[in-house]
């Protein structure tokens, strides 16, 4: 084998080795590219999943906030309607007083009156009737009691005995009853419970 033949064989060998190195480099490049694509696809899928979860959480929070605001507005409206009903009942009660009612309420209060001087506060114009009712219920109490008119009609009577004020007016009775009955009234009006 001569020098030219040796050069040719060495050239072929170098070309073959170069092809093998290029093929190995191409395979390694394809492997690295495939791994990079798989990693990018995984990262993209993870980011998309997280974005979907965050978006769903945001939508859920928005729906809950809207529902909460709707419930709050409904509660405010129901409270407003209940208060309007209470005020309407109060207005009707103010005109419901009369001598018979005043006498009945006075009879309930007298046992709690005590022994000192008394002041009986009644609707304007009802002083004489209540004075007569008081005298017929208990003349001794009537002797130590002063009957005076309230600034405005409210229905019922109030009894002042020293520092104690025994309020048996219709608005006072409504206030006491309202705390007990408000839930039942709401249930009847709004179908709750």
From Swiss-Prot:
Keywords for this protein: ATP synthesis, Hydrogen ion transport, Ion transport, Transport
Gene Ontology MF term list: ATP binding; proton-transporting ATP synthase activity, rotational mechanism; proton-transporting ATPase activity, rotational mechanism
Keyword field contains Transport: yes
Top-rank taxon: Bacteria
GO CC annotation, single: proton-transporting two-sector ATPase complex, catalytic domain
Role according to the record: Produces ATP from ADP in the presence of a proton gradient across the membrane.
HAMAP family, sorted: ATP_synth_E_arch
Name of the protein described by the UniProt record: V-type ATP synthase subunit E
Annotated organism of origin: Anaeromyxobacter sp. (strain Fw109-5)
Lineage: Bacteria, Pseudomonadati, Myxococcota, Myxococcia, Myxococcales
């Amino acid at each position: 084998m001569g020098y030219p033949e040796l050069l040719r064989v060495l050239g072929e060998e170098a070309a073959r080795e170069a092809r093998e190195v290029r093929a190995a480099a191409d395979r390694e490049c394809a492997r690295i590219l495939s791994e990079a694509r798989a990693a990018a696809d995984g990262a993209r899928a993870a980011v998309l999943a997280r974005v979907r979860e965050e978006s769903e959480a945001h939508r859920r929070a928005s729906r809950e906030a809207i529902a909460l605001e709707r419930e709050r507005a409904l509660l405010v409206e129901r409270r407003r309607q209940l208060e309007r009903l209470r005020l309407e009942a109060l207005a009707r009660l103010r005109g419901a007083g009369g001598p018979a009612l005043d006498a009945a309420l006075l009879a309930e209060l007298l046992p709690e009156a005590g022994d000192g001087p008394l002041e009986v506060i009644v609707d304007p114009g009802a002083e004489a009737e209540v004075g007569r009712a008081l005298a017929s219920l208990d003349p001794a109490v009537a002797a130590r009691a002063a009957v005076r008119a309230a600034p405005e009609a409210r229905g019922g009577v109030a009894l002042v005995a020293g520092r104690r004020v025994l309020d048996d007016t219709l608005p006072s009775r409504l206030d006491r009853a309202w705390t007990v009955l408000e839930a039942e009234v709401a249930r009847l009006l709004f179908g709750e419970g």
